[in-house]
Amino acid sequence: MSDSPVTLPESIKLTEYSHGAGCGCKISPKVLSTILASQLPVFTDPNLLVGNQSRDDAAVYKLNDDIGIISTTDFFMPIVDDPFTFGRIAATNAISDIYAMGGTPIMAIAILGWPINKLPAEVAQQVVDGGRQACMEAGIMLAGGHSIDAPEPIFGLAVTGQIALTDLKQNDTAKAGDRLYLTKPIGIGILTTAQKQKKLQDEDSHIAVNAMCQLNTIGTTIAKISGVNALTDVTGFGLAGHLLEMCQGTKLTAKLKFDAVPLLPRALDYLALGCVPGGTHRNYDSYGEHLPELSEHQKAILCDPQTSGGLLVAVSAEAEAELIALLDAHHIAPICIGSLETPTTEANVVLY
């Protein structure tokens, strides 16, 4: 099957129809906190194992003593011009939340907003087909969905998954001494901004796309390692933002080896050209007070919003070799980017 079954007129470029792109469209963490601060009485359900208290990747509901159901949704505006590829990336990103909990996806439904007076329905059909392709790669059906007439194109999924409760991983359960590993390089926001600014060279157009279309299926297997204490995916809040969620949920400090953070090819070249997404600045404004003093270069990398980014893994020293062997077997460079320690400073993240 071709990744682009219908040829688009040269005049149609999806990124020109939206003010934001991918997970860079996310509302900043600080504003989101205001939105989620409900004034209603607290309602609890003992079977809801994971809700929004820890800003985890998905909700988990206990069906019985052995099995839980995972529920998540994610959608955004175009991050690439090709509609099929946009749909595939958006779906891959949404499904990732299931893997980030250690689960297995079982079905998805589509969420589509479309400016029907600006873009042909045939273009939307290609977007949905891209979503179907990602679902097929994940082994699930795109079982339905909902659409509205919207001023800008939006696409994503609501995904349902299941998990053996013994394998459930959360973002706030790390332990002091855990090593930190990242399964995909950073730099997607930089490269996609280069495209939006029309600075991206044709020979580099595949770099971010290939990374964003890579499913995080390895999360299901990582979760079976008993020494993996916490797991999350790195998306719109950037590496620093999602690492902070892990630290604040466990009251630990992350010692981050900045020079060890893996970067996508050419990311530094485009960063030098000023390709910094607006989401980077929003991220830093939201949580910069919890970080050490950073250079502009460090901010641009650590706060770079990722779309369909990799998994951030916190693993005990005793299980580190098992994780490394698994990453090697899946052709993922096993690079330790730091560790989690008992706090010795007010900052949640320190660099060395």
UniProtKB/Swiss-Prot annotation:
* Binding locations of ATP: K26, S54, R55, D56, D74, D97, G145, H146, S147
Residues flagged as site, Important for catalytic activity: K26
Reactions this protein catalyses: hydrogenselenide + ATP + H2O = selenophosphate + AMP + phosphate + 2 H(+)
Instruction: Fetch the Gene3D superfamilies from UniProt.
Output: PurM-like C-terminal domain, PurM-like, N-terminal domain
**Active-site residues, as the UniProt record annotates them:** C23
Give GO BP annotations, semicolon-separated: selenocysteine biosynthetic process
Cofactor binding mode, per the note? Binds 1 Mg(2+) ion per monomer.
Q: Report the EC code(s) recorded for this entry.
A: 2.7.9.3
Q: Which GO terms describe its molecular function?
A: ATP binding; magnesium ion binding; selenide, water dikinase activity
Keywords for this protein: ATP-binding, Kinase, Magnesium, Metal-binding, Nucleotide-binding, Selenium, Transferase
- GO CC aspect terms: cytoplasm
Query: How does the record describe its quaternary structure?
Result: Homodimer.
For this protein, the record's HAMAP family field holds:
SelD (MF_00625)
Its recorded name reads Selenide, water dikinase
- UniProt lists the gene as selD
